[in-house]
C-alpha cells in the first residue's frame, strides 16, 4: 500500500507543472478575447486613424479620432495593450509616451480612402462574426441530440441556415459578400504573382459560386483574352457591380447546371459541403469542361490539411478553420479525402500547389 501511494505521489504534477498547466488552460479560455479585441479595433477603425496620423498615434490621438467617451480612455489603453501584445499593432516609447504603429497584420485592416489595397477587415468580420461564434456553443447539442444532428450548429443556435440568414438579413449579407470580395482580391493577387501559369492557354473560365466576381475580375484584367463567367444564386449576381466588360454573370443553381468553359474555378466553395454534394458539383464541372488535352481542368482554391507552410501558425489555422467550418457542417480536407471525391466524381489526376500559406491551389484533370 505504502509503495502504491509513493508511486502515485511521484506521478503527481510538480508545482511548476501545475502552474503551467493552469496558465495554458486559462489562456485557451481567454482566446476569444483576441477576436473581440480585433472586432473592436475594426469597429473603431483604429488602423485607419493611425494611418491618417502619419503612421503613428498616441492614445490621445486615438481617443480623439474614434469617438471615445471621455470616461473610457483607460479602457482604450487596456484594449491597445492586448492588441499590441498579440501583434495586431506595435507600440514604442517616445519620450515617455506610448506611440502605436501599424504592423503587417493591421495594414490588412486599412479600408478608408482607397488605402487598403489588401483590405481584409470585412473578411475578419465574417470569420469572427458573433453569429458564427455563438453557433459553436451548440456543438455539444449537435453531437448528442437526435433532432440537432440533422441540422447544422448554426441552425441549432439561430433557427435558420447560414445561407438563409445571409439572404434575409441585408446587413449580414452585405458584410459577408464584402468579406468574400476582399478575400478573393488578396488570394488572386498572390496567385497571379506566384502561379499565373495556371491560367495560360485557356480562352474561357467560369467561377462557380463566384459571388460579386472579384476573382473573375482579377483574372479578366490579367488575361484579357479569357472570357470569364460568374455563376451564383440569382439574388447574389443581381447585386454584383459591373467590374469588368469581359465578365458575364449568370444566376443559377450549381447543383443543377454549370455552363461550359475551358476551366471551372471553385474558390472556397467545396469546404461548405459534405462529400456527396462535392461529388455532385464536381461531376457537373466535369461535364462543363473539355478533355485534358484540350485544356480542360477544374481549379480549386481550398485548404489541404497538412500541406503548406511548416510554421505552427498556418498549420494550426488549418485545423482551427476545419472546426470553424463545422458551424455550417462544412469541412477542411486532407489530401486523401480530396483524392477520394475527385476519383468518385470521375477525374483522373490532380496537382496541389501550396502558394497561399494555409490554402492551396488544386488543379483537377478529367
Swiss-Prot record:
The active site is at 271 (proton acceptor), 302, 332. Its EC number is 2.1.1.4. S-adenosyl-L-homocysteine binds at residues 209, 232, 253, 267. It comes from the Eukaryota. One of its GO terms (molecular function) is S-adenosylmethionine-dependent methyltransferase activity. Its main location: cytoplasm. GO terms for biological process: biosynthetic process; melatonin biosynthetic process; methylation. Expressed in roots, leaves, stems and flowers. It catalyses: N-acetylserotonin + S-adenosyl-L-methionine = melatonin + S-adenosyl-L-homocysteine + H(+). It is an enzyme of class 2 (transferase). Keywords: Cytoplasm, Melatonin biosynthesis, Methyltransferase, S-adenosyl-L-methionine, Transferase. Pathway: Aromatic compound metabolism; melatonin biosynthesis; melatonin from serotonin: step 1/2. One of its GO terms (cellular component) is cytoplasm. Belongs to the class I-like SAM-binding methyltransferase superfamily. Cation-independent O-methyltransferase family. Methyltransferase which catalyzes the transfer of a methyl group onto N-acetylserotonin, producing melatonin (N-acetyl-5-methoxytryptamine). Homodimer. This is Acetylserotonin O-methyltransferase 2. It comes from Oryza sativa subsp. japonica (Rice).
